[in-house]
């Protein structure tokens, strides 16, 4: 089934200048980038986007990291886009990620793990709406 999902290329990946390589992974695996923008999240935006993690011990560090530099947010579209994107990203901890996944190849740590991807269709819908107006894709 054709789906849409959100992907965020995080500040660590932008600093390493691997944005193009990450986008190529998506495109060469059947995911089309239908909307994309580069931006610098404010603390408020990062806190609102990651509100589900507010009570978790890593929340403060996550927010500090996500506002430490620019990010690239994208809407990806394709067959089973949510699952395909998650497979391409690999495990949250790059040490546990399978060889050839984005996180295994480009991430430094569980905190600086290169990419974010929606974990369900419902969350994809909400996350896309957080960053993009319908007219943008």
Curated annotation (Swiss-Prot):
<keyword id="KW-0546">Nucleotide metabolism</keyword>
<protein>
    <recommendedName>
        <fullName>Nucleoside diphosphate kinase</fullName>
        <ecNumber>2.7.4.6</ecNumber>
    </recommendedName>
</protein>
<feature type="binding site">
    <location>
        <position position="92"/>
    </location>
    <ligand>
        <name>ATP</name>
    </ligand>
</feature>
<dbReference type="InterPro" id="IPR036850">
    <property type="entry name" value="NDK-like_dom_sf"/>
</dbReference>
<keyword id="KW-0460">Magnesium</keyword>
<feature type="binding site">
    <location>
        <position position="113"/>
    </location>
    <ligand>
        <name>ATP</name>
    </ligand>
</feature>
<dbReference type="GO" id="GO:0005524">
    <property type="term" value="F:ATP binding"/>
</dbReference>
<dbReference type="GO" id="GO:0046872">
    <property type="term" value="F:metal ion binding"/>
</dbReference>
<keyword id="KW-0479">Metal-binding</keyword>
<comment type="subunit">
    <text>Homotetramer.</text>
</comment>
<keyword id="KW-0808">Transferase</keyword>
<feature type="binding site">
    <location>
        <position position="58"/>
    </location>
    <ligand>
        <name>ATP</name>
    </ligand>
</feature>
<comment type="similarity">
    <text>Belongs to the NDK family.</text>
</comment>
<dbReference type="GO" id="GO:0006183">
    <property type="term" value="P:GTP biosynthetic process"/>
</dbReference>
<dbReference type="InterPro" id="IPR034907">
    <property type="entry name" value="NDK-like_dom"/>
</dbReference>
<keyword id="KW-0067">ATP-binding</keyword>
<keyword id="KW-0597">Phosphoprotein</keyword>
<dbReference type="GO" id="GO:0005737">
    <property type="term" value="C:cytoplasm"/>
</dbReference>
<dbReference type="InterPro" id="IPR001564">
    <property type="entry name" value="Nucleoside_diP_kinase"/>
</dbReference>
<keyword id="KW-0963">Cytoplasm</keyword>
<dbReference type="Pfam" id="PF00334">
    <property type="entry name" value="NDK"/>
</dbReference>
<dbReference type="GO" id="GO:0004550">
    <property type="term" value="F:nucleoside diphosphate kinase activity"/>
</dbReference>
<dbReference type="GO" id="GO:0006228">
    <property type="term" value="P:UTP biosynthetic process"/>
</dbReference>
<feature type="binding site">
    <location>
        <position position="10"/>
    </location>
    <ligand>
        <name>ATP</name>
    </ligand>
</feature>
<feature type="binding site">
    <location>
        <position position="103"/>
    </location>
    <ligand>
        <name>ATP</name>
    </ligand>
</feature>
<keyword id="KW-0418">Kinase</keyword>
<dbReference type="GO" id="GO:0006241">
    <property type="term" value="P:CTP biosynthetic process"/>
</dbReference>
<feature type="binding site">
    <location>
        <position position="86"/>
    </location>
    <ligand>
        <name>ATP</name>
    </ligand>
</feature>
<feature type="active site" description="Pros-phosphohistidine intermediate">
    <location>
        <position position="116"/>
    </location>
</feature>
<comment type="function">
    <text>Major role in the synthesis of nucleoside triphosphates other than ATP. The ATP gamma phosphate is transferred to the NDP beta phosphate via a ping-pong mechanism, using a phosphorylated active-site intermediate.</text>
</comment>
<keyword id="KW-0547">Nucleotide-binding</keyword>
<dbReference type="InterPro" id="IPR023005">
    <property type="entry name" value="Nucleoside_diP_kinase_AS"/>
</dbReference>
């Amino acid at each position: 089934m054709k789906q849409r999902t959100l992907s965020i290329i995080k500040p660590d990946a932008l600093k390493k200048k691997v944005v193009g390589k990450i986008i190529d992974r998506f495109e060469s695996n059947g995911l089309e980038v239908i909307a994309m923008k580069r931006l610098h999240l404010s603390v408020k935006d990062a806190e609102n986007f990651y509100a589900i993690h507010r009570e978790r011990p890593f929340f403060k560090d996550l927010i500090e990291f996500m506002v430490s530099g620019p990010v690239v947010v994208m809407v990806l579209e394709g067959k089973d886009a949510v699952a395909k994107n998650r497979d391409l990203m690999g495990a949250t901890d790059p040490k546990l990620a399978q060889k050839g996944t984005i996180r295994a190849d480009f991430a430094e740590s569980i905190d600086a793990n290169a990419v974010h991807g929606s974990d369900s269709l419902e969350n994809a819908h909400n996350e896309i709406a957080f960053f993009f107006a319908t007219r943008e894709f």
